[in-house]
Structure formats: C-alpha cells, structure tokens
Amino acid sequence: MSAILEGTPDKRLVLVTGRAYPELAEKVAECLGTEILETTSYDFANGEMYVRFTEPVRGADVFVLQCHSGDINKWIMEQLIMIDALKRASAKSITVVAPFLGYSRQDKKHRGREPITARLIFDLFHAAGADRIMTVDLHAAQEQGFFDGPVDHLTAMPVLLDYVRSALDLGNTTIVSPDAGRIKVSEQWAAKLGNLPLAFIHKQRDITRPNHAEAHGIIGDVDGRDCVVIDDM
C-alpha cells in the first residue's frame, strides 16, 4: 500500500505524523486506506530536533497530524519543523491536524502585560507554511479568527453524546457545568439528551495562583445521580 493516496492527476493526499502519538495517525491511515509517509525524526544531544521525509511530496496535499499533549512545547516545535520541511519540498497544500491545539486556553488577556499565546501559535503555524488548520473543540470558537486561512473547527459532542446514551441511565443523569463559562454548552448537552436536569458549580479562580480553583458550592440536584461534567480543557 502506498503512503500517497492517489486521486486525480493533480490531487494526491499524504498523511504525516509527529512522534507525540503516532497510534492515532495509524488509525486515521487505516480509515483512509493509506499509509503514513515515512519520516526520519530524532533529537540531537543539545535538544534540537531533526525531521526529514523519505519520499517526495511535491504537488501533494499533506496533512500533518500531531497531538499537543505531554511535552507540549516539544511537539508543537516538531510540527512546525515538519511544516517547514514540507513547504521547502514543494507540497501543494499543508493542513495542520491538531486534535488538541496547545495554548488554546490562553485566548485573551486577563491582566495587563500578558500575552495572547493562542494567537501566537496560529501565527507560528502560518509563518511556517501551513495553509489550513483542523482542530477539535477550541477553548473559544472565536479563535478561528486568529488564523489567516481556513480553520476546520470540529466538535466531539456527537461522539460523546452517543457514549453517554449507551453508558448511563439518562433517567438518573444530571449534566453539570463546572463553572459559569460552560453553562451554555452544558445547556446544549442537556437539551440533546432529552432535557436532562442541569447543575452548576460555583467556582472561583485566583489568577495569581497557577492551576488553583476553589469550589464554593453546587446549585442543582446531584444527590445519588450520575453526573456528566462538561468541562473544556
């Protein structure tokens, strides 16, 4: 099986992946009936990374799949290097596939002299040579406007709804919003599952203390019920 999925003479699809989670790319390739383009990737002793593709990609539509989890900064950098290599190898188009887009939570300034790092990430992908970005459930849908090109903003809600329907007794299930920012999405979940009861956690976050939030109470009926908490990331 070829690593290049042939279409019309001017249409070739190529899937490449970084080292963060190659198992996902293998499943995608299986669904597409193709193979992942072989890539030589390794780290130098000083921490720098090297990437080279073993087959030509000239004129191909290339999808670069990388999961931004674990060592997030390393995997974003590796994906940027892959994009640069593809651009210099004359790929026809380059699509970034990042199921979880790193730094998506940092989409606005809370205080003075803070960065908007989500915008920076989109700018870096554009500067490296990406033509399009495909991602799932951004922290805020408005982030699509950070990229100067098409953004395919997918949602996992249909898949997760099917799981909840099959795994839980909906007659004894409550949808829970973990904070004020997720109430709207939690209402959508409750409606799609048959107008389930909705609860809300009153939570406050101290922006001066990283990774710290304090829950002050919960509004709604959760006693003895299965709770589905609709958080973002």
Place the predicted regions along the sequence by residue.
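PRPP-associated nucleotide enzymes
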Residues: M1-M233
